[in-house]
Amino acid sequence: MSHSDQTSPLEARKSAALSGTARVPGDKSISHRALILGALAVGETRISGLLEGQDVIDTGKAMRALGARVERTGEFAWTVRGVGVAGFAQPEAPLDFGNSGTGCRLAMGAVAGSPITATFDGDASLRSRPMRRIVDPLEQMGARVIQSHEGGRLPLTLQGARDPLPITYRTPVPSAQIKSAVLLAGLSAPGVTTVIEAEASRDHTELMLQHFGATLVTEPEGAHGRKISLTGQPELRGARVVVPADPSSAAFPMVAALLVPGSDIVLTEVMTNPLRTGLITTLREMGGAIEESETRDDTGEPMAQFRIRGSRLRGVEVPPERAPSMIDEYLVLAVAAAFAEGTTVMRGLHELRVKESDRLEATADMLRVNGVKVEIVGDDLIVEGKGHVPGGGLVATHMDHRIAMSALVMGLAADRPVKVDDTAFIATSFPDFVPMMRRLGGELA
Ligand SMILES: O=C(O)C1=C[C@@H](OP(=O)(O)O)[C@@H](O)[C@H](O)C1
Ligand SMILES: C=C(OP(=O)(O)O)C(=O)O
């Protein structure tokens, strides 16, 4: 992304009651998958509601470089003409995934099942993130790392397998990115590729693979896990994909409306896949007034409308098994916890350390510089809620969109303004965050 050399700070101030109706942009996870499966399918895939954030745009560019035809046909409307399973062309230049772990890791899986060699790269944040977790299973399937930076990090050159082997793989951590990479590579292997996860992670890849014509069976595994078996070498056929609004983006106006007294907002068409709704469960346990209506399930993923009203929140304990269903939402939950009465304990957050930034440390710093008492104990985050937040701090974004948005939400309700050093990365996942929050009444300047 070119914006890493220009920073744009912003300040959020205590705002009057938020009101209005908004639809946040399309879901990021589904948008990446629609482009990648469209590129692996035969025929045309028509996507509506695609997230036009930089992360997804970078995935679209990579699919083009691998031989797919990717075109924008209208606002949030895109078509992809795919090359078929294992049909990727050799890219001429390194594939640049910018800030996006999802785009990069899912594309690695897809490339691992094609007889080509591709170099994967990204910005300084993505270059610092672990890739061994992805290439380990892909090497078991026959792909080979030709070159990588220290510790298996980007830039990394991967040679796809000529004859990929189907494997059974137990993911070492709950991660939809690892699971998806193995399944996408498994598309070109003969026989059944199986992924076993001890805790279920988001299942958009599984649902969309079936929508594109693959045969896949999901069974329960233990108390919270799943076993997913994909039959290899299907003919994927281009399909129509309707992308619902992203619950991870909806989280920001949702928490803002709970925190700013007297607020009353509506968020429409928010995806409600149960593997993504941990934040809503938690905010309701804290006493948040969140009403769901107009639930629909006609486009492959469920969605609903939410009315959110200003609420007095109380501290809660969030169990570790809930983490996969709200992994990207802990930053903004920590903000809600800071405004609650009482202590909130969020358990089992080790995966937060390997996101766009070390989100465990960054969240603690964000709260501390704004006068909130917070502690990290092992993998747990403990926030002492005092019913209000002093604010007045400058928050370091660390190339992480969710830190920037969380800090700005905090500033809308804190006693004194909260400033972030750089808002540029918000464009990776929620390009119209600032104008949308302003339309709802948020004071951002
Ligand atoms: O598969 C996906 O679309 C994603 C999976 C999660 O990452 P992990 O698989 O690393 O947990 C999440 O944090 C990311 O924003 C999107
Ligand atoms: C972790 C995230 O994304 P990614 O892994 O795709 O960079 C996120 O959007 O919060």
Curated annotation (Swiss-Prot):
Active site: 328
CDD domains: EPSP_synthase
Biochemical pathway: Metabolic intermediate biosynthesis; chorismate biosynthesis; chorismate from D-erythrose 4-phosphate and phosphoenolpyruvate: step 6/7
Annotated signal sequence range: none
GO molecular function: 3-phosphoshikimate 1-carboxyvinyltransferase activity
Residues that, per the record, bind phosphoenolpyruvate: 28, 101, 129, 177, 359, 402
Keywords: Amino-acid biosynthesis, Aromatic amino acid biosynthesis, Cytoplasm, Transferase
Function: Catalyzes the transfer of the enolpyruvyl moiety of phosphoenolpyruvate (PEP) to the 5-hydroxyl of shikimate-3-phosphate (S3P) to produce enolpyruvyl shikimate-3-phosphate and inorganic phosphate.
Protein name: 3-phosphoshikimate 1-carboxyvinyltransferase
Organism: Rhodopseudomonas palustris (strain BisB5)
